Amino acid sequence: MMSTRTFGETIEEYEVQHLLGKGGFASVYKARCLHSHQDVAIKMIDKKLIQGTGLTSRVRQEVEIHSRLKHPSVLQLYTFFQDVNYVYLVLELAHNGELQRYMKQHLLRPFTESEGATILRQVVAGLLYLHSHNIMHRDISLSNLLLSKEMHIKIADFGLATQLKRPDERHMTMCGTPNYISPEVVSRLSHGLPADVWSVGCMLYTLLVGRPPFETEGVESTLNKVVMSEFMMPSHLSFEAQDLIHKLLKKSPHERITLEQVLRHPFLKRTVGGSSYSTTPGALNEFSQSLASSDSGIVTFASSDSRKSHRLRSVDNSSGQSMPQIMEEYLPSSNLGYDSKEHRPVYEQHGSYLPTPGDQLENRDAKWPGTNNLAPFTSDSDMIPSPVGEKRLLMPPLETKRLQPTRYKTKNAIMSILRTGEVVLEFVKFKVKYNEDRITDICRISEDGRRIIIYQPDPGRGLPIREHPPDPLIPSENCVYNYENLPNKHWKKYVYAARFVGLVKSKTPKITFFSSLGKCQLMETMTDFEVRFYSGAKLLKSSTDGVKVFNSNGAVLSDNGCAEARNLIDHGNECFSHCVNISNALELAQTKENTCFPVTIGRRPAADMHAGQRFDGLRDTTNFAYSTPKSNQGSINFSVSTISTTRSASDYNSNTPRLNMLAAHQNVPIKRITVPEIGIVTELSHGVVQVQFYDGSMVSVIPKVQGGGITYTQANGLSTHFGNNDDLPFAVRDRINQMPQLQMKLKCAPLLGNARSVDCHLMTPKTTTPFYNRMII
C-alpha cells in the first residue's frame, strides 16, 4: 500500500469532481489528490444516517477489514478520515466500472468461456487471499467486481465482509444479493467460507449465460429457487464449464469444490493454461475502456437492473446491542494490526461455531449397541441446556445421505425421502367438507437435517393427497427454521422425521461382506447388522430388539448361551467388527465427489453354492438364478411414541402335492419380454410374475397357491412383502397398476427354451435340496 502520507487526511486536500454513484447512506465521487495528483474514488458516508439506522458497526467493520488488505484482485483502500458530518474512504479508482454494467451496456453479450476463465481466475485468487486471512466477503456478485484501467478484476464492497476467528467458524447473519446468496444463508443456517464459493458459481454462470442461475421476477421467488437449488444448465456450455458450475453450486456446503480445486479444474486448465495467477489482461484485451466507477460500498447504483440486483442488508440477529461512537473507532491504519485482538470487530464475540453432521458422527463405538436409539423424546431429559439456558433437542440432526427415495403412508402422516435427500412429512386430517383425508401441515427437512420448513398449505382446506409430495413452497421467511432455533412446538415433527429416517437407515445396507460362513450386512445406522448363514441360520442385531438368532429351520434360539447360538453369535461379533473397520477405512478414503458406499466385499464361497448358482464373473447380468420371493422386511408401523416393524402373516398351503413338487425344483424363467420404458417382465415356473423396472426396483406377484401377495424390492435391495389385504404404498400401487397390461403381453410371449424341460421335471418329482430365496448378480 502507498504511504497514507501520500494522500490527504482531510477532504480539503482533494479536488472532488463528478458523482459516480449514490445510495441510501453514502455517495461516491471521483476525485484527485492534490498531493500525489492521483485519481481516486472517495466514498462519503453520512454519519447521521448510519448512526440513526444502526449501521455504525457495519462501517467500522468495513474499515477494519478493508484497510489491511493488499492484493492485485482486491480494490485498495488508501486511507480514511472523518469530520463532523461524514466518514471518508479514499479508494482505488476502477476506471472501467462494474463488471455487470460493462457486460450489459458495453459488451452486449455473455462472456466467452476463455474470457470467463480469465475473470474467474482473478476472482478466485482474490478470494483465496481473503480466506487465507479468515475473511468471508459474503457479497460476491458482478456488481461488486470492478474493472481497473488495465481491465483487471477488483473485488470491492466489504460492507458485508466479516472476520472469522478460524476458518471453520460459522455465522448466522442473513445478508447478500438474492441472485448470489447461498442456500444455507437463505435458510438462516450457520455458514462459513463455502458461502463465497457458491457466489463464485453464480458469478461464473452469469458470465457465461448472461443472467444469474436463480433469477426470477421477485426476491421471494428467487430465494425459493436458491433454497431448492433449482437451475437450468444451458446445453451450449462445454462439459468442463458445466462440471465446474455444478461443483460450485452444490446445495450442501460440505460437498462444494474448494477454491484451490477450482484453480486445478480442467475448465481453467483448458481455457487459460496453467495454475499461476497472472496480471496480464489476456482475453480481456478486447474490452473497451469507457466506464468510470469505484467501490460501490453501501451504494446501490441506479440502473435498469436495480430491481433484480436489490441487496439484502442488515438482517443480523446479533445487532441489538448499542455501538460505540464511530469517532472512537477510526484509528490510523497503522494501528490496525492484523493480529490485534482489541481492534477486531465487536460482533465477532457473538459468532458461534456449530458442529457439522460429520463432527457428530465421529468416534463411533464398534460394539453392539446397548441402548434404544429410537426411544421417545418427550421428557426434559431429551433436551439439553444451550449456553443461554434454553432447551434444545438432544438428538443430532438427521441425515439422509445414500438413502434411496421412498414413500410410506401411516394413519396420520405420509413420509417421503426424495431423490434430493430431502425429507417431507405430510400430516393428514379428515375433512368433513370434502369427505376425505387432506394434507393440513407440511414439514420439509434438508438432507443434512439443519434446514426445516413448516407451513400449512391452503389453510383451512388443505391439499388432496397425491402420489408425490406437493411442490416446494416457502410462504414466508417465518416458515423457515434451522436445527438450532426450531421452536419446541415443532420438535415432535422433527423427532417423527428422524425416526422415519432411522428406520430406513436400519434397512439400508452400507457394507455387504461375504464371510466363510455367511452373508453379512452392516446397515447405514452402523448399529443394525445381520448375518444370513449359508447353512440357513440367521443372526439379526438391531438397536430396538437386541440380538436374535434363528437356526437353519427358521426357529428362534431362545437360549443364546447354547453351543449352537454361541457359535453363531461369536462369528457375528467378529464379522461386525470387521465390517465396522472396513467402513472406517473407506470413510477416510472417499472424497466429497466420490463416495465408497454402499460396498460389497468378497463373494460366497463356491463350495457352498448350489450348482445352478455358480457363474462366471463376466456373464450377462440378466442371467439370474430365480426363486419365489419372500419377505425379509415387514410393513412399517409408525407412531409418535414408538416405531415397530410387523410382518404380514400369509397362510401357505403346503399340503397340496403340486406345491411339494414346486418346492423341490428350481424356480426358472419360462417366459420373458422386454417392455420399452418399463423394464423386463418374467414368468417363473412356479407361477410367479416378476417385473424388473429400469429404475432398479422389482415387483413380484406371487400366486395364491404359494400364499399370494406382492413382494416389492427397492433399488437398494430392500424388500417388503404385502398381503392381499395390506394397504400398498404409493410407489408399489403405481407399479401394480401396470401389471394387467404387462401380464396380457406376457401371455402372448413364446415359451423359453427351458420351459419344456421344466414341465417334464414337474411330472416326475425328485428329492432335491430346496433352493433358497437368493439372487446372484
From Swiss-Prot:
CDD domains in the cross-refs: POLO_box_Plk4_1, POLO_box_Plk4_3
Catalytic activity: L-seryl-[protein] + ATP = O-phospho-L-seryl-[protein] + ADP + H(+); L-threonyl-[protein] + ATP = O-phospho-L-threonyl-[protein] + ADP + H(+)
Principal EC category: transferase
Subcellular location as annotated: Cytoplasm, Cytoskeleton, Microtubule organizing center, Centrosome, Centriole
One matching Pfam family: Plk4_PB1
Coiled-coil residue windows: none
Keyword Ubl conjugation among UniProt keywords: yes
Free-text description of this protein's post-translational modifications in UniProt: Ubiquitinated by the SCF(Slimb) ubiquitin ligase complex; leading to its degradation by the proteasome during interphase and regulating centriole number and ensuring the block to centriole reduplication.
Protein name per Swiss-Prot or TrEMBL: Serine/threonine-protein kinase PLK4
Organism listed in the record: Drosophila pseudoobscura pseudoobscura
Gene name linked to the record: SAK
